[in-house]
Amino acid sequence: KSRTRFQAVITNCRTGEAEYPDVKDFRTDTVYIRASSSLPFLSKMVKINGELYLDGGVSDSIPIKKSIENGNTKNIIIMTRDKKYRKKQSKLGKISAIRYKKYPKFVELMNTRFSRYNEILEYIYELERQGKVFIIQPETPLNLGRIEKNKEKLTNVYNIGYKEAEKRYSAMMEYL
């Protein structure tokens, strides 16, 4: 049995808050993983203890502050976007307001996600400059959709990530 703590990040649709449940047993705690990967518009909300949840990335895209709060001093962040990427404002604002009208705090999160994401990027890049986090990310855009199913594209992106990790391995071990 591993002593490593594993937390999922899920977004409470009613409160608009990120929650970080511990996943202790993958046989019984799969509901947290399901909620954590339930993308807005594409997935149904996941009910947990009477509350409805969706993807944690809506409320906390890169949960580095939670990791630091948990006492982790060596953090490795694996990104799927290159360093130049910045999120743009979603064009789905009105659709979000209609689809999630019973959850105004969630709608607000959806409408401000781009700015919060870009702020956390600046934060992690500053931490990287200070030597407080280690970031692995592609050098160029991957040109991959969020729900990509093309096996050739997925294999190519996997290989890019693997090669980038190999290239950065020595520096990462030095950081650790």
Predicted segments — roles?
Residues 1-176:
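Patatin-like phospholipase
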